[in-house]
């Protein structure tokens, strides 16, 4: 599995190197001076590697399980590498990169190729990793000749191998956290996986539904509900993904790679956004308990052999009608009167009619 990336100061070149570090590393302080620049052939670094940087003011979060700190790239937009192969980095990595002003563009290319990924699991020669530097919280590092801005390294890695295993490798190694966006709502990713991918409407239809039903609440500065907040975040994430796909389509020269990245975003990430949008819109429309009950009912139905289940799957819109529990007691008075029954002419009515005829 891929190793984490940590910062390593090279006093000979007065630059910071990004080096892989094992997940067990927590940066225990050591008193030894900084050693020589390790050779590129090393696949990992010791657990206490880079801990000396704490003496120079590097924040503790550089060694936490949440992820290391790294250089803030002011002009970098994309870094690209290939597993087990050399890949020329795009020329957008200019000398303006903080902390690396003394290095040429060619040095930057070799620098990242040698230091960035060294302990990635062998997934094949065709697997490409697209790494986009987004940003994060900043810290100060007091060093000569001037203070440098630092921040958490925040990466989005889109792997061209659309498998669950590859996706976990691409993302799980960065944070090491088990985050389920449905957990606080009583559901889980596994529960949503009961529904097939073609069950969820298109993102355009879901966005139109959210806009038609909850636009005022979504645009409101007030906190309406956790579902409204989650909807806002999902809509914003999809907008950023669309910007990313548009940028890749415009700047990636290789048509095959461009198609792979755009297709991966639309299919894999698009499915996750569709699930999120559907879940929160449905919870706001039908109620969370009804949606959870529907997920369980659908999961039971689809996992039952066809010979032993009803021909039609449960429908969320009709589920509340079959699960309403009415209280005992007098039923409320109906507003619409019942149709009058035709009365037979009784002797009393006949007598009244005879009297009227006499008058």
From Swiss-Prot:
Top-level taxon of the source organism: Viruses
Q: Where is this region: Disordered?
A: 25-48, 312-359
Q: Name one GO molecular function term.
A: structural molecule activity
SUPFAM superfamilies listed in its UniProt record: Hepatitis B viral capsid (hbcag)
Q: State any GO BP term from the record.
A: symbiont entry into host cell
Q: Can you quote a single GO CC term?
A: host cell nucleus
Composition bias type Basic residues, residue spans: 325-352
Q: Which InterPro entries match?
A: Hepatitis_B_virus_capsid_N, Hepatitis_core, Transactivation_prot_X, Viral_capsid_core_dom_sf_HBV
According to UniProt, the name of this protein is Putative X-Core fused protein
> Which organism does this sequence originate in?
Hepatitis B virus genotype C subtype adr (isolate Korea/Kim/1989) (HBV-C)
């Amino acid at each position: 599995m891929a190793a984490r990336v940590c910062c390593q100061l090279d006093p000979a070149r007065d630059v910071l190197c990004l080096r892989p570090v094992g997940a067990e590393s927590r940066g225990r302080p050591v008193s030894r001076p900084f050693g020589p620049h390790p050779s590129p052939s090393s696949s990992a670094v010791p657990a206490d590697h880079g801990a000396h940087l704490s003496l120079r003011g590097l924040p503790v979060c550089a060694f936490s399980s949440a992820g290391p700190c790294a250089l803030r790239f002011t002009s970098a937009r994309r870094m690209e590498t290939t597993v087990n192969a050399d890949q020329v980095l795009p020329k957008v990595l200019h000398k303006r990169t903080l902390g690396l002003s003394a290095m040429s563009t060619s040095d930057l290319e070799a620098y990242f190729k040698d230091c960035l990924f060294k302990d990635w699991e062998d997934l094949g020669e065709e697997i490409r990793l697209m790494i986009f530097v987004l940003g994060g919280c900043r810290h100060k590092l007091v060093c000569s000749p001037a203070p440098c801005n630092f921040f958490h390294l925040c990466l989005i890695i889109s792997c061209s191998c659309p498998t669950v295993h590859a996706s976990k490798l691409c993302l799980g190694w960065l944070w090491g956290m088990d985050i389920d966006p449905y957990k606080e709502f009583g559901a889980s990713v596994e529960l949503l996986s009961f529904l097939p991918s073609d069950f969820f409407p298109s993102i355009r239809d879901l966005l139109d539904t959210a806009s038609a039903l909850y636009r005022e609440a979504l645009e409101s500065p007030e906190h309406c509900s956790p579902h409204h907040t989650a909807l806002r975040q999902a809509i914003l994430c999809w907008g950023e993904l669309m910007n990313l796909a548009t940028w890749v389509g415009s700047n990636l020269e290789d048509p095959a790679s461009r198609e792979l990245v755009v297709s991966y975003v639309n299919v894999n990430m698009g499915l996750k956004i569709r699930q999120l949008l559907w879940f929160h819109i449905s919870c706001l429309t039908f109620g969370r308990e009804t949606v959870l009950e529907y997920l369980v009912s659908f999961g039971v139905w689809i996992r039952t052999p066809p010979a032993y289940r009803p021909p039609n799957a449960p429908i969320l819109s009709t589920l509340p009608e079959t699960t309403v529990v009415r209280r005992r007691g007098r039923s409320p008075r109906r507003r619409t009167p019942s149709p009058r029954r035709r009365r037979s002419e009784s002797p009393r009515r006949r007598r009244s009619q005879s009297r009227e005829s006499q008058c």
